[in-house]
Amino acid sequence: MALAFDEFGRPFIILREQDQKTRLRGIDAQKANIAAGKAVARILRSSLGPKGMDKMLQGPDGDITITNDGATILEQMDVDNQIAKLMVELSRSQDYEIGDGTTGVVVMAGALLEQAERQLDRGIHPIRIAEGYEMASRVAVEHLERIAQKFEFDVNNYEPLVQTCMTTLSSKIVNRCKRSLAEIAVKAVLAVADLERRDVNLDLIKVEGKVGGKLEDTELIYGILIDKDMSHPQMPKQIEDAHIAILTCPFEPPKPKTKHKVDIDTVEKFETLRKQEQQYFDEMVQKCKDVGATLVICQWGFDDEANHLLMHRNLPAVRWVGGVELELIAIATGGRIVPRFQELTPEKLGKAGVVREKSFGTTKERMLYIEHCANSKAVTVFIRGGNKMMIEETKRSIHDALCVARNLIRNKSIVYGGGAAEIACSLAVDAAADKYPGVEQYAIRAFAEALDSVPMALAENSGLQPIETLSAVKSQQIKENIPFYGIDCNDVGTNDMREQNVFETLIGKQQQILLATQVVKMILKIDDVISNSEY
């Protein structure tokens, strides 16, 4: 415990239990923080680009995840260090805001930290480095605006959207089907998009998966798919022109909410009670038929006797449907969710062209398709695959593609990928450094060098000579003054990203630079780390 004394000689505590805490100050704290950030970036660096490696992660309960999605890798890593946790948050915020570029943003932050360490070794103050980085990031973002290209698309001509989504999917495990998956993602987004307001609600796109079949069997359903079947095996498997009652109330006789009990001591009394319950449920079924319902979808269950009665009355039903699915069914069919049975009216019924039950494989697993709905602004992407891991990774890939398509609808500007945008920004930032007379000039040049880390990592992961490849592409960009030359990762034979159709969204690339700069500035400003000792 550290004690100090005031002017009257009275002791007071500055730092409680100091002997049980470890403390790093000044340059040591900054070096330790930078080392932690670089360690996280090093893990993800090999996952960048179309030839990036996958990581296998084992959870505490033995579940295995195989992925190269930056956000997922960091999410599932058991990180203790607080600076490493900041890098995890950085990746998560990129995923939340943009949906893509989660690996690139961490690699960029790691490179900025590495360059900052060199500047600290030269004796430059961390605040001056942070200010230099801020200036450089502004130059880079403005340059991206200048080299960005706008493109037009509509519901009938969406090829540019597909090409951009294919760039996103090319680094995933599903890249052999990237064309078909990109088309599915774009069609799904356009189906739910409000093109006038240029807004997309991704909650209206449900992504379902079922083990079996192959990746090529993945399909887009203009409607809702639920992992349920009809409550009775003898109910019809297909209903044309369905009128759907969507219930969140129990579809059974009500339970009395009192502490009273009924004593039944004779067979006649039991028979009377059973008949009363049956009559009550009979009336409920009749009410559904009277309002015109041809299918009941219920959030709760009902017993076998009720199920049998529904089958006899020719009223198909589905039970134990989740709340999120009910909401999507209501949106798709134009129906209203009925919380109290007495409120069921014909106006609250949803309408669907066809509701069908489909079996999969030899295990007779069934799912319910609700298609040709009154309101098509709710769709389902149904993924097939050889195993659960493949389906989970495909879901993550589809999520990235959906986010990219949404971002392009919001902002139609694109930049060229393959490291072309980073190289162009690096050259622009390097040229701008001469305009700043102060010490910040060194930090701005360091920022330009850090931008080169992304194309370097792309070249390295593709099995190319990173330094040779980068210098060749840089000189090509300077010589021809064209910012579209990048790293030829797929060995096509041309560095021109326009010919390779490698696009990225402008806002995704800008967000990467801004978020990485913010986190690095935050880390550089920490000069004192007090943590509990391990002993």
Curated annotation (Swiss-Prot):
Cellular component terms per the entry's GO annotation: chaperonin-containing T-complex; nucleus; plasmodesma
InterPro entries cross-referenced by the UniProt entry: Chap_CCT_epsi, Chaperone_TCP-1, Chaperonin_TCP-1_CS, Cpn60/GroEL/TCP-1, GroEL-like_apical_dom_sf, GROEL-like_equatorial_sf, TCP-1-like_intermed_sf, TCP-1_chaperonin
ATP-binding listed as a keyword: yes
Protein origin, superkingdom: Eukaryota
Gene Ontology molecular function, alphabetical: ATP binding; ATP hydrolysis activity; ATP-dependent protein folding chaperone; unfolded protein binding
Gene3D superfamilies per record: GroEL, GroEL-like equatorial domain, TCP-1-like chaperonin intermediate domain
Claim: Nucleotide-binding is one of the keywords in the record: yes
Keywords carried by this UniProt record: ATP-binding, Chaperone, Cytoplasm, Nucleotide-binding
Covalent S-S links between cysteines: none
Places the protein is found: Cytoplasm
Family: Belongs to the TCP-1 chaperonin family.
Subunit description: Heterooligomeric complex of about 850 to 900 kDa that forms two stacked rings, 12 to 16 nm in diameter.
Purpose of the protein: Molecular chaperone; assists the folding of proteins upon ATP hydrolysis. Known to play a role, in vitro, in the folding of actin and tubulin.
Record-given protein name: T-complex protein 1 subunit epsilon
Gene that produces this protein: CCT5
